Amino acid sequence: MGFATRTALRLIFSKKKKTFINFLSFISIIALSIGTAAMIVVLSVYNGLENTLKSIYKDFDPEIKVEKFESKYFEDTYKEVISGIENISEVSSIIENKVVLQNEEKEVVAYLKGVDNNFTKQNRISKNLTEGRFIFNFDNLDYGVIGRGIKYSLGIRTNSDFQSIKVFSLNEGKKLTPSMTQQKMYNEDFLKTAGVFAIESGFDNNYIFTSLGFAQTLFDKKNYISSYEIMVEDKENIEKTKEKIKGTLGSDFLVLTDVEQRAGLYKILQTEKLVVYFVFFIVLFLSAINIFFLLIMM
């Protein structure tokens, strides 16, 4: 008879069997309690992270965004039609594209976002200003509102009378050839800095806001936009509103809610939560099975 078998038989028939089983039961219950508490804490952290991300993106992303399939720009002729749909409070015309920003010898690549007056009324960016004001025109001069990261990268001084940002945009309307001069390859203009916003580094390092007219002229896209950004009156009915917009505009347009605009990120969070559920389920299941068999042995 092996050592393991003799030890097992002694435990089974020993007077100390009950005490030993009680000890194992206590350990199993402790493990089960710790596992349950850990699962609650971890899931609470994930839920808190998700809510935090939603609150951050809420200031930057619209509740509904409309873009055109297979086309970067489209004519700004649908605004009134969309505005007439039930549950819509604001419709903003937006044009956005990559640009190069230059201040003296410093340069950064960023997204220039041209917005109309309706966007300004929504107060989404202006409430996150750390310096200056959210204005785009003053004394016949064009202004931009930049992210804090761009300010540091370019060494910008807000509201300086002597400092302007030089903005370059690739001339997409012309075919590039080796003989083209830089002047023909790029459209360029100047912006003064009206304010600085701080939301999240991904936005702060990459975005500059200005007027719709300035951006359309720079991109050589007069009367064209890249998207509509829409705010709704009742968020509970956002899916119904989205479907109405799709029905009105037709299949040529892509209509996304705020969650769908960040679908990849939220999908990762949900996947991680499911993995956590699965791991803790296995731990709790094994602990529960252990307790069950210990109770049978008592």
Sequence positions of predicted segments:
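N-terminal Sec/SRP start-transfer signal
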Residues: M1-A37, E50
